[in-house]
Amino acid sequence: MNDEFKNIIESLIFASDEELSVKQISDILGSFNKPISATEIENIIDKLNFGYKANGNAFRIIKVAGGYQFATRKEYAFFVG
């Protein structure tokens, strides 16, 4: 996995107020001359989630309404309302 792409995708999803679709992520990266396929984006998101789970993070990236966003894992959702 390309760490630069991983960090960019993670940052985009984290900073977004709304879910981001694979196309939106691809378009943003493409506008910076960093083309990436939909499959690569989805693989990176899967690997990010694997790392979050392995590290015991309280959050993950979920697919919602055709896009991706950060969410608190259900066992911690009670604490954040």
Locations of regions flagged by a protein language model:
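Phospho-regulated, low-complexity intrinsically disordered regions of nuclear gene-regulatory
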Residues: 1, 9-12, 71-81
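Positively charged, polyanion-binding regions of nucleic-acid-associated proteins
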Residues: 2-19, 45
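Charged low-complexity interaction tracts in eukaryotic proteins
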Residues: 5, 43-77
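Conserved, well-folded catalytic cores of nucleic-acid-processing
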Residues: 12-15, 32, 51
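A short acidic, leucine-rich amphipathic alpha-helix
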Residues: 24-28
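Short, positively charged loop/turn segments that connect secondary-structure elements
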Residues: 30-41
